[in-house]
Amino acid sequence: MRVLLSTCGSRGDVEPLVALAVRLRARGAEVRMCAPPDCADRLAEVGVPHLPLGRSARPAAAGEAKPLTAEDMLRFTTETIAMQFDRIPAAAEGCDAVVTTGLLAAALGVRSVAEKLGIPYFYAFHCPSYVPSPYYAPPPPLGEPPAPEGTDIRALWERNNQSAFRRYGAPLKSQRAAIGLPPVEDIFEHGYTDHPWMAADQVLAPLQPTDLDAVQTGAWILPDERPLSPEMEAFLDAGTPPVYLGFGSLRAPADAAKVAIEAIRAHGRRVILSRGWADLVLPDDRDDCFATGEVNQQVLFRRVAAVIHHGGAGTTHVATRAGAPQILVPQIADQPYYAGRVAELGIGVAHDGPTPTFESLSAALTTALAPETRVRAEAVAGTVLTDGAAAAADLLFAAVGEEKPAVPA
């Protein structure tokens, strides 16, 4: 069986597909992946052929934070959809299945090309609030003002549906017409299918009934056995467990690193700062802080006092599995949902708003560093399942058929 995996999102969208790719290859499938150019080195590490798709996310992450306008989003989605129609046909040639993850814009063109080529298409999402449901409010549309507080959940989803048609309807209709396909009636169902997979843990992100027939596989996490660097090992051994601070592949709030380090120091704790794609820097050269680039979070998070992060699905799952108390400073998309879940489970704190202050982080650290939070985090860690990618591979083989010719893993 030959499988094309595709996303045009951040590192958090790519890593689950890496885990799925490894599981599929272990079962004899041939896998290739369309992903942003930033991910070339990561895919080379696991031996998955990489076909660049989408823009590099690094310049945006490192740039000054600017609110996205509706015009920005329309331009981005038009370019993204056009790029999918341009590049996916060649990438999907000879494939027996296509699997996509990410936001809606990452899926629409891919689904249409798969439809044209007659290739089975599957979509996976990482957060319950991504699919229409009476139980979850959707993430607010990027570039648009928030809805009035107290708006009914169904009204919020209708608002999102209208926003999706404004953004995606015209460019999708135009591209589909160019290859002889009719317009789509339901933007969400077209991208997500009527039977999507949710790649998230059942405890951390329990799936309530949705308008689509979704199935929860568990999180797609690839076990990471890379050792920590000798320099980081020496730092960890030189004192009490530090607090980890990082915002992954996203833009960080202004002065977030400086403010957070001041708050962490005020609690008498040391700091490990992940530079991330925003290229965060230490405020000084004191020996109580250690800055790092790419690191094995699965190993590191088991050795820290707490984890301060943006609340993306991947980082939240890794920190939860490690039993580390968390402080989530959510910015966009799935992050507010995961911040709320961490607080509900008693394994950390959901920061109120996207911009931390010394006072807000100091209060959050008081809770996160409390012994009872650590006890609760360690208890929940033991309930997180680790075989979601294997379950998804089983679903794919069952849906497409075991009779497809296998290739060496």
Swiss-Prot record:
Keyword Transferase carried by entry: yes
Entry EC number(s): 2.4.1.-
GO molecular function, one term: UDP-glycosyltransferase activity
Example GO BP: lipid glycosylation
Alphabetically ordered keywords of this record: Antibiotic biosynthesis, Glycosyltransferase, Transferase
Disulfide partners: none
Family the entry assigns: Belongs to the glycosyltransferase 28 family.
UniProt source species: Amycolatopsis orientalis (Nocardia orientalis)
InterPro entries: EryCIII-like_C (IPR010610), Glycosyltransferase_28 (IPR050426), GlycoTrans_28_N (IPR004276), UDP_glucos_trans (IPR002213)
Listed name of the protein: Glycosyltransferase GtfE
Misc remark: In A.orientalis different glycosyltransferases are involved in biosynthesis of the vancomycin group of antibiotics. GtfA (AC P96558), GtfB (AC P96559) and GtfC (AC P96560) are involved in biosynthesis of antibiotic chloroeremomycin, while GtfD (AC Q9AFC7) and GtfE are involved in biosynthesis of vancomycin.
Keyword Transferase carried by entry: yes
Higher taxonomy: Bacteria, Bacillati, Actinomycetota, Actinomycetes, Pseudonocardiales
Primary role: D-glucosyltransferase that acts on the aglycone core, transferring D-glucose to the phenolic hydroxyl of OH-Phegly(4) to form a devancoaminyl-vancomycin (DVV) intermediate in the biosynthesis of glycopeptide antibiotic vancomycin. Also able to glycosylate A47934, an antibiotic with a teicoplanin-like heptapeptide, but lacking sugar residues.
Annotated metabolic or biological route of this protein: Antibiotic biosynthesis; vancomycin biosynthesis
